[in-house]
């Protein structure tokens, strides 16, 4: 989900691939360690765009020490990927997986990346009890109430 909090509108509700060691079909195991090939949880701020080995990419700076602060040095960036599509799921039974990056479809990569570039807050969520108790940026009581409604 990509939500414009100012206008309170959903901009995108689309597929996103996670790191290959984060889980098979669903993400459930996260890391802040280089070489883990796992995605990270928590709050990020988007940086600039660049052309990398995966094409158009977006730098992500992790804002939570111990949870995702190594994102930039781990090269955790948002990028497009051919393995993020309904067709890939039909052929393989699930999305492909990245080396830890949030990867979006080639069809939407430009629109999503340029929408989020340069100073957008990005939040990667999973109901991980350690993250929820350690995060200094979350209102965990409010989040707990949200989880109860979902």
Where is each model-derived feature located?
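Cell wall/extracellular polymer interaction/catalysis modules
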Residues: 1-99, 106-120, 124-150
């Amino acid at each position: 989900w990509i939500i414009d909090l100012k206008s309170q509108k959903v901009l995108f509700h689309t597929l996103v691939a996670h790191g290959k060691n984060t889980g098979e079909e669903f993400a459930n195991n996260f890391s802040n360690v280089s070489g883990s090939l796992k995605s990270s949880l928590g709050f990020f701020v988007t940086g600039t765009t660049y052309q990398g080995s995966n094409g158009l990419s977006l730098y992500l700076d992790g804002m939570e020490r111990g949870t995702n602060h190594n994102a930039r040095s781990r090269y955790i960036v948002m990028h497009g990927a051919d393995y993020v599509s309904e067709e890939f799921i039909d052929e393989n039974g699930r999305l492909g997986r990245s080396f830890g990056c949030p990867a979006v479809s080639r069809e939407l990569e430009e629109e999503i990346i340029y929408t989020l570039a340069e100073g957008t807050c990005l939040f990667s969520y999973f109901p991980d009890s350690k993250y929820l108790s350690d995060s200094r940026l979350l209102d965990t009581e409010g989040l707990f109430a949200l989880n109860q409604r979902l």
